[in-house]
A protein has these predicted regions:
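Periplasmic-binding protein-like
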Residues: 141, 169-179, 201-204, 210-211, 242-268, 280-304, ...
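A bilobed periplasmic-binding-protein/Venus flytrap-type ligand-binding module shared by bacterial periplasmic
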Residues: 146-151, 188-189, 258-273, 289-290
Length: 341
């Protein structure tokens, strides 16, 4: 039964790792080329960035067509659950921003066990995320305060998370929704841990504009519809680099780290292409593309973009998997009680 509350004791206590399939890259690649296709359900990044990744994979392996299904984490998860309920094998690789999804699917046997060759090059902070060897971190991101640089001076921009609660930002704040976005859900759990639910009761008094994805905040800042927000460093910096009025602050009380895994479905219709794609997501090309998108590399030896801060220079709040598994369902209900949606 895919319930997150019953998962918590398993996550907290850990599980013995069963035998994991090891990578035979030459054989996998040959078989993947024969399969010729892969379907990727992903909540990682925005749609444009996800398409860049899919195109890079196809450029390297022209025989393999990538069908990209990009949406928010909760929507992708519900679609996958519906597939499973109906006996439909469509998704090959599942990439969520909510670790609770990965834990639930792993515990229910929906993920294949696989040990990617490229997993050995993960940074130490990202090693061993799943001792059972089914999902691996393929992307990381930070959520920080962002602002419209045409309407807010740097000196006046929020310097910490409680600064978003200042009454001067009433009707000027934008956030995503934890019932749609795993990134937003993780951020909400982190804020509750730091400041209690009172943080969101005070935020509600500022009448925020609530989107779905964490990326929505960047769009409404860029348009000037709102002028401060909780947003992702990646899309924020890409948008700013294109000459748009989006700035960010590394908050004094810590950016929120989002660790986003990918896993191969046990019923993947293209299992070898899925393994090859998982290797690609953990490999140097995807690491470079992630860094070019101003996201945090999970692979060792990947340089950050000029002007971007390396993670060891940033104060970071990182939740445990158990905190995310237990916390996101709780804050979704609290959010609906407070914000009415």
């Amino acid at each position: 039964m895919l319930t997150r509350r019953t998962l918590f004791p398993l996550v907290a206590g850990g599980l013995l790792a069963p035998r994991i399939a090891r990578a035979d890259l030459a054989g996998i690649e040959a078989a993947a080329r024969k399969e010729g296709a892969i379907t990727w359900y992903t909540a990682h990044t925005d749609g444009e960035s996800a398409q860049i990744v899919a195109d890079a994979f196809t450029q390297r392996y022209p025989e393999i067509k990538v069908t990209l299904i990009r949406t928010t984490a909760q929507v992708a998860y519900q679609r996958l659950l519906q597939d499973l309920k109906n006996g439909i094998a469509q998704c090959d690789v599942f990439s969520s921003t909510d670790l609770g999804h990965d834990e639930a699917l792993r515990a229910d046997g929906k993920f294949a066990k696989y040990a990617p060759e490229n997993a050995k090059d993960l940074l130490p902070a990202f090693q061993g995320l799943d001792p059972a060897g089914t999902y691996y971190p393929t992307l990381s991101e930070l959520v920080v305060p962002i602002y419209n640089t045409a309407k807010v001076k740097p000196a006046d921009a929020p310097k910490s998370w409680p600064d978003l609660l200042d009454p001067k930002w009433r009707n000027q704040v934008a956030v995503g929704h934890p019932a749609y976005s795993g990134t937003v859900g993780t951020w909400v759990v982190a804020m509750r841990k730091l400041y209690g639910w009172e943080y969101f009761e005070k935020l509600e008094a500022n009448r925020p504009l609530i989107g779905r994805s964490v990326n929505d905040a960047v769009g409404v800042l860029n348009s000037g519809e709102r002028i401060v927000a909780a947003g992702p460093i990646g899309l924020s910096q890409v948008t700013a680099a294109r000459g748009n009025p989006v700035g960010l602050v590394y908050p004094s009380d810590g950016a929120v780290l989002i660790v986003s895994p990918s896993a191969i479905m046990a019923n993947a219709p293209h299992p070898n292409a899925a393994r090859l794609f998982e290797e690609f997501l953990l490999g140097p090309t995807h690491a470079r593309l992630s860094a070019e998108g101003y996201r945090l590399p999970v692979r060792a030896g990947t340089p950050v973009q000029p002007g971007a801060k390396p993670v060891d220079e940033i104060k970071v709040n990182r939740l445990t998997t158990a905190e995310i598994v237990q916390g996101i369902p709780e804050v979704i209900e609290q959010w609906r009680d407070t914000f009415g949606s």
